Swiss-Prot record:
Its EC number is 3.4.21.92. This is ATP-dependent Clp protease proteolytic subunit. It is found in: Cytoplasm. It comes from Nitratiruptor sp. (strain SB155-2). Its main location: cytoplasm. Transmembrane segments: none annotated. One of its GO terms (molecular function) is serine-type endopeptidase activity. Cleaves peptides in various proteins in a process that requires ATP hydrolysis. Has a chymotrypsin-like activity. Plays a major role in the degradation of misfolded proteins. The active site is at 99 (nucleophile), 124. Fourteen ClpP subunits assemble into 2 heptameric rings which stack back to back to give a disk-like structure with a central cavity, resembling the structure of eukaryotic proteasomes. It catalyses: Hydrolysis of proteins to small peptides in the presence of ATP and magnesium. alpha-casein is the usual test substrate. In the absence of ATP, only oligopeptides shorter than five residues are hydrolyzed (such as succinyl-Leu-Tyr-|-NHMec, and Leu-Tyr-Leu-|-Tyr-Trp, in which cleavage of the -Tyr-|-Leu- and -Tyr-|-Trp bonds also occurs). NCBIfam families: clpP (TIGR00493), PRK00277.1 (NF001368), PRK12553.1 (NF009205). The gene is clpP.
Length: 196
């Protein structure tokens, strides 16, 4: 199913200019991460983060997240870029932040991680599958366990929880309300009104 991307028209003293809504939001340093996180989505998010840093390295960037998660390596490219650039990255969950979406939500600048009142946040261990020869399956299993360890350590750092607690809580899907995610340390505040 396809959907229409709205255009907005700005009127200035020099005339009119139309933008697709996402380009217009980018002018206000807002990036939308919606849907499954894959290489194409990650490349777009990374490019926007780098562009906004080049525009003004001292102004915050706002990353709005409504995502069921996705590919770990794609999400890690966004995570690494968020940490690489100079501007603070404020994360805001709208709708849901699950799996890698929740990981990125928790990875915003401390004190600037938010969720709307009815958002849902879910953390769990990495998912994967392997096929082929026994040796290939063993290689894939070792890699997913390595990624699980890295993700658990980063989530522990982001939330203030112990790695042991993160490992236990992510053993299965662990859903939270916005308030519960705040208590857990995934976010800093539940927003009733815009923080901007």
């Amino acid at each position: 199913m396809s959907y229409y991307i709205p255009y907005v028209i700005e009127r200035t003293g020099r005339g009119e200019r139309s933008y697709d809504i996402y380009s217009r939001l980018l002018k206000d340093r807002i990036i939308m991460l919606s849907g499954e996180i894959n290489d194409a989505v990650a490349s777009s998010i990374v490019a926007q983060l780098l562009f906004l840093e080049a525009e003004d390295p001292d102004k915050d960037i706002y990353l709005y997240i409504n995502s069921p998660g996705g590919v770990i390596t794609s999400g890690m490219s966004i995570y690494d870029t968020m940490n690489y650039i100079k501007p603070d990255v404020s994360t805001i969950c709208i709708g849901q932040a699950a799996s890698m979406g929740a990981f990125l939500l928790s990875s915003g600048t401390k004190g600037k991680r938010y969720a709307l009142p009815h958002a849902r946040i879910m953390i769990h261990q990495p998912l994967g599958g392997a096929q082929g020869q026994a040796t290939d399956i063993e290689i894939q299993a070792k890699e997913i366990l390595r990624l699980k360890k890295i993700l658990n350590e980063i989530l522990a750092e982001n939330t203030g929880q112990s790695v042991k607690k993160i490992a236990k809580d992510t053993e299965r899907d662990f859903f939270m309300s916005s308030e519960e995610a705040k208590e857990y340390g995934l976010i800093d505040q539940v927003l009733e009104k815009s923080a901007r």
